[in-house]
Amino acid sequence: TIKFTKKNTLAVKGIAISFLLCYHCFSQTARMGGAEVSFWPLPQNLAMLISLCMVHCVGMFAFLSVYGLTLSMKSKYPEYDFDGHTATLFVLKRYVKLVLTFLVPFVFCVGVTFVTDTFRYPAGMFANIISIIMDFFGVGHMFGGRMLVSTWWYLSLEVLLIFPVALQIYRKYSWLIMMLFLLPGSFLIEKHVHLTKYLFIVPRAICFADQQVFERLKSWKPLKSQALSKFLKFVVSTGMI
């Protein structure tokens, strides 16, 4: 049976990390720190524009997270017929695992920013401690605090909280969930709510995982030429992600 395996997930994560590095290092002149960078064979403006577009790495991480969460829940509840207590425990376990995984790199980065005088938190011992604690648990953005990681860390928690609700909506409305999410998303984007940039990813990842879209795409043979078929499938799958 053809499956979108953990190995495939790690490969996509590797691509997303490459996007992340390009975006943070080369999307703006100020981010190069005055260093002379050669973008050969591309013109510098074009290379920087491509790097700027790689901000979609956050969306890729969010997609993979929800995709994995859906498969995990589906393995236990094929019909997604779980109750509120089960959903709460599922989110809580994932949240604890998420926080513990982030503990070492977070503490390390806080230490480095303190030593290099690039600290992101407000002045004052008490305010710093409160901000660090809220940031670590992913709730800094919710309470208006300063954050060391300004996007995907708090977003990972918000996506986790949305997931059980989105899954129940999908259970009832199937693919229509994407249209249902687009309506509030379009309204909130006008209000400059950061989460809505990635809100559409949640139902899409759920649909892709449940309907085995990648598995079907992998077994799809659109052209007689194997090489051209692989290239076409690569283009289609990249566009989907």
Predicted regions: what they are:
Residues 181-241:
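Alpha-helical transmembrane segments and terminal signal-anchor/GPI-anchor hydrophobic tails
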Residues 1-186, 230-234:
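Membrane-cytosol interface segments of multi-pass membrane proteins
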